[in-house]
Amino acid sequence: MSLHVCPFWVGYLLLSPVRKLLTNPDRILEPYIRSGMTVLDAGTAMGFFSLPIARLVGESGHVVCVDLQERMVASLKKRAVKAGLDGRMEFRVCTTDSLAIDDLAGSVDFALAIAVVHEVPDPRAFLAAIFAALKKGGGLLFSEPAGHVSGDGFNGSLSLARAVGFEIRTTRKILRSHSALLSK
């Protein structure tokens, strides 16, 4: 798979209030995230999901936000400081070869990979890194945009997820996306 990186300016579009109305992050995340959890947002961009996660995990929780683009992470950090949530958030820049989360092995309660797996050069390695970071029984909300990824393409990614050890718990309805809840 070739590397496609979301242009930085698209990060601002992803934060659109219209997107929030159509794809409400709180409604999507509330069934899975509780106070005190450690949550990984892999492919965080400017934090459309990260800031709501930080509110949901509360003061005793922790959100690890990882993205390939330093500018995206810097923008998210500014937004987190402005929202007063930066104390419960960690910001990391990864590389095309590593998600940079090896130190999290077995410590993450829940993870998100929203509209990102189709952009990484090695989806299997990406999913394996998330699997390793999760605690036993931990979950991954995996979603890809239907406009970029076909149903067959998403099923291929689910096969990769199974190959690294994930179990598919259920599919999810998220507007214009192929989505599933996976578990370790």
Where do the PLM segments sit?
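Class I SAM-dependent methyltransferase SAM/SAH-binding core
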Residues: 40, 46, 51-99
